[in-house]
Swiss-Prot record:
It catalyses: L-seryl-[protein] + ATP = O-phospho-L-seryl-[protein] + ADP + H(+); L-threonyl-[protein] + ATP = O-phospho-L-threonyl-[protein] + ADP + H(+). NCBIfam families: PRK11768.1. The record marks S36 as: ATP. Its cofactor is Mg(2+). It holds the Pfam family APH. One of its GO terms (molecular function) is protein serine/threonine kinase activity. Monomer. Transmembrane segments: none annotated. Mg(2+) binds at N206, D217. The gene is srkA. This is Stress response kinase A. Keywords: ATP-binding, Cytoplasm, Kinase, Magnesium, Metal-binding, Nucleotide-binding, Phosphoprotein, Serine/threonine-protein kinase, Stress response, Transferase.
Amino acid sequence: MNDNAFTFQTLHPETIMDALFEQGIRVDSGLTPLNSYENRVYQFQDEDRRRFVVKFYRPERWSVDQIREEHQFALELVKDEVPVAAPLAFNGQTLLAHQGYHYAIFPSVGGRQFEADNIDQMEAVGRYLGRLHQTGRKRPFTFRPDIGLAEYLFEPRQVFEDAALIPSGQKAAFLKATDTLLSAVTECWRTDFATLRLHGDCHAGNILWRDGPLFVDLDDARNGPAIQDLWMLLNGNKAEQRMQLETIIEAYEEVSEFDTAEIGLIEPLRAMRLVYYLAWLIRRWGDPAFPKNFPWLTGEDYWQRQTTTFIEQTKILHEPPLQLTPMY
């Protein structure tokens, strides 16, 4: 997936509207960009006042087979009555192409922001995650990757080594902190967990609330442990996180089994996300949208803070993992 140098500068509004017109959709409103840096996503209304979202995928990030697997997973979830935003089919195809771009069209789904501190909402999310994972366990992804150390740690480490935008005065300390963190994660990482198809990026921003949860954006769907779709929902101090996790697991287990031994993967997964996110920003720096929206990435203070964050996360990895109350 060598997509580092790509930009969306050739994706003009006329190109988008032509692509939609090819599918029989006439745009009757403007194209409203939605918050997405990795892809380009727009909301619009057609002549019949129906609202849609069109998503143009970043070329070469995912293969055609990988995107189709994501779409198939979404459609399976809908069939199993799991509330997800799934792509629409045109002439039997959900993945469409126009002028070198692949794209998909979704119904526009409104909703309020999921309230991460609302225990009732957290319980409902836990129940539906159990159902989502029931579907995910039916078979693994064939083309999409597994969550693992190579993609999330070792490849990003090389990105840091090669990155010219990390200030020279901070690079040595940052790389040292990175290496220490990588060693700590490697020591406590496990591969004996049950693998299933995951949402992959299940945080509060990817859940809408409409008399219940609605999961959106399966772009990061992968194979991995169930805990990956739970830990990003936790917030606050350890006591608050314990209560939230117990709420999620209790609701989850109404419909699906959960291996509580996976709780020990929360902090390694958090460390992997920290490392991967920084490498992602560096890889995308050639896209003009990134320097514009992340101007602080070249600053000394920013990298000093990241070094401190990595050191603190290493300390957390050496502490006992989050513990549930004895009933679990």
